[in-house]
Curated annotation (Swiss-Prot):
The lineage of its organism: Archaea, Methanobacteriati, Thermoplasmatota, Thermoplasmata, Thermoplasmatales. Keywords: ATP-binding, Kinase, Nucleotide biosynthesis, Nucleotide-binding, Transferase. It comes from Picrophilus torridus (strain ATCC 700027 / DSM 9790 / JCM 10055 / NBRC 100828 / KAW 2/3). One of its GO terms (cellular component) is cytoplasm. GO terms for molecular function: ATP binding; dTMP kinase activity. Belongs to the thymidylate kinase family. Its EC number is 2.7.4.9. Pfam families: Thymidylate_kin (PF02223). Signal peptide: none annotated. This is Probable thymidylate kinase. One of its GO terms (biological process) is dTDP biosynthetic process. It is an enzyme of class 2 (transferase). It catalyses: dTMP + ATP = dTDP + ADP. ATP binds at residues 13-20. The gene is tmk. The keyword Nucleotide-binding applies.
Amino acid sequence: MIDNGSMFIAIEGIDGSGKTTLAGDIASYTGFYLTREPTDRFCYDYIEADYNDESSIINFFLFTLDRYMHQKEIKNHLINGVISDRYVFSSIAYQGSGMEKRFKNMDETISWMLDVSRFIIMPDLIIYLKIDPGIALKRLNLRKNEKKNTDAFERLEMLKNVSKYYDYIFSGIIKIPVIKINAEMEYNYVKDEAIKGLNDYL
């Protein structure tokens, strides 16, 4: 928590875990400023769609640039508290799992990505929505505006790799409190657990 008592909270989890809905509800509950990543200024023109090491490195730097530009917005609202729908650990989980073959192991991958991100503001608290990738993919396929992926198996494997990274990151290797919630439960349960956990830090 920063000196004046305000708080910066990041909500993390794989696609389909319910981050955006929860971020909005937590912002309403706390009165905190709601933001998200990628930001509205993010340029998708250079994003690489392939899930491989080279594309993941390119995408990581694009998202990191957006995040550094996001810092001013976050700083301007910290005094009243900030909620972010995705933040740095989304990049580490998504792009890290794709670029891992460039490094010795997961630890070295994460260490390098955190070093590149060392000047950004880190959150005071993380809410991690844990969900089985297969269930998350079913949810995504039910969304009317969700682009249907022709290779469901490939996307499922990607979500499994990302989930593995999230689980490892939030297993205790970072010195940030993490509220872990079973996002496979009914949404009201997820919301209540998030608020209950959050109240211990407010």
